[in-house]
Design a protein with these regions (language model features):
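Extended alpha-helical scaffolds
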Residues: 6-148
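Accessory, solvent-exposed terminal regions and/or long lumenal/extracellular loops of proteins
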Residues: 169-171, 182, 187-205
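Structural detector for short beta-strands of small beta-barrel domains
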Residues: 146, 152-184
Length: 205
């Protein structure tokens, strides 16, 4: 009888533990929604700045304007948008280089950055609004999550069904890149799955 009572208590204790683990999900959902809304605010800022840049033209940016845009870059860090933040850093860097040497390559690179920022702002907004409409605000496998600066954890990849165990891989190539604007080194590894022929890459920052 004592053993049954003990077993019952252990079961109740275990169930209580499970319930305690489930409780934070509501907090996580609220935090996720709050973060998404903050990101949308950041996209509003990107829209205003990019529209201004397109209207005035990149070549008209002066020293004072560059300082203002650098302040905007810092602000983007408060909006959970590290992806667009790095892109904006690169845009400013290319403009500075263009003003120094007048090499049109830098100007074209700056334009490409601006185009990407506009695209991320529009598509990112649609993606984030769609995420808010979902009942489950878990991480999705949409690449826009990565474009906005999100980084998938191994546990999240597993939940998304993107984790593969016991895979036999061969490394096809390896390279290290350095982004002068963001001051970030990135190690890239390119792999092929021997069994499926699927090619993928890994990136370490």
């Amino acid at each position: 009888k004592k053993e049954k009572t003990k077993a019952k208590k252990e079961k109740e204790s275990a169930e209580g533990t499970v319930k305690e683990k489930k409780a934070p999900s509501k907090v996580s959902k609220a935090a996720r929604a709050k973060k998404i809304n903050k990101q949308i605010e950041g996209l509003d800022l990107i829209k205003n700045i990019s529209t201004q840049l397109l209207k005035l033209g990149l070549s008209t940016i002066g020293t004072v304007s560059l300082k203002e845009y650098k302040d905007v870059v810092k602000q983007l860090g408060d909006y959970y948008l590290p992806g667009p933040q790095i892109l904006f850093q690169k845009l400013i860097f290319e403009i500075q280089e263009y003003k120094e040497d007048q090499d049109t390559v830098h100007y074209q690179q700056a334009l490409e950055c601006l185009k990407r920022l506009r695209a991320i702002e529009k598509k990112g907004r649609e993606y984030l609004n769609a995420e808010l409409e979902k009942e489950n605000l878990g991480i999705s496998d949409n690449t826009l999550y990565e474009d906005l600066g999100g980084v998938w954890k191994l546990e999240q990849l597993n939940d998304l069904g993107l984790k593969k165990e016991n895979a036999r891989l061969i490394q096809l190539a390896f390279e290290v890149t350095y982004d002068e604007a963001s001051k970030i080194f990135t190690d890239y590894g390119y792999w092929i799955d021997i069994d499926s022929g699927e090619i993928s890459y890994t990136a370490n920052y």
